[in-house]
Amino acid sequence: MKTFIGIMIPFLGTALGAACVFFMKKNLGNLVQRALAGFAAGVMVAASIWSLLIPAIEQSEGMGKLSFLPAFIGFWVGVLFLLLLDRLIPHLHVGSNQAEGPKSRLGRTTMMVLAVTLHNIPEGMAVGVMYAGFLAGNAQITAASALVLSLGIAIQNFPEGAIISMPLRAEGESKGKAFLGGVLSGVVEPIGAVRTILAAQLVIPALPYFLSFAAGAMLYVVVEELIPEMSQGKHSNIGTVFFAAGFSVMMTLDVALG
């Protein structure tokens, strides 16, 4: 039951964020959107470092001076994996008029949902890897540390849910369809987590690689999507301030509770 709750918490964060479309009459202002993107980016960077990369290095201490190697390799594989998906799947980032990936006849709404869905994949995998390690009895991964990562991702999923549902509403979709689009963008997370847990026999022996893989993929999302979003438009420090806030929240959660 703990595992089920843990893998569903991030999805709940997305759904709650998407539900903002029912309570907010206007589209997200530019400053609000930049603040939300900055906060989400801060949470993801902190989670990648404290919950994924550092544990990956610690679990490779037996390799001596080469203990960094699994984290280095996994990190780069994660970055390249997301880069490949970006090239193969047509998608449209919020606030952009230029679609990425191969040419497609898909509508703007579908491609906007695909963009967020694509970048939610590593988050689901990260949660799955943590719970796979916990269920396998890994001494360095506790129920608390796995739950902290789930909570951290849920916190950053809340603004992400709003960031996708509100623009969909502004595009002319009904509130129900805009909410559904936001929710669907998060479905991939519990699915990815479950698939990773089911593949535990493959994951556990290479746990440092999988932890750093998730970190690399998440940091790719931060640099490729969230940093441009928090920096777009007229210069403002709002995105940077909220990045620091998100980073601090996730760091505190991980150190205090994990």
Predicted feature locations:
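Intrinsically disordered, metal-sensing/regulatory segments
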Residues: 1-258
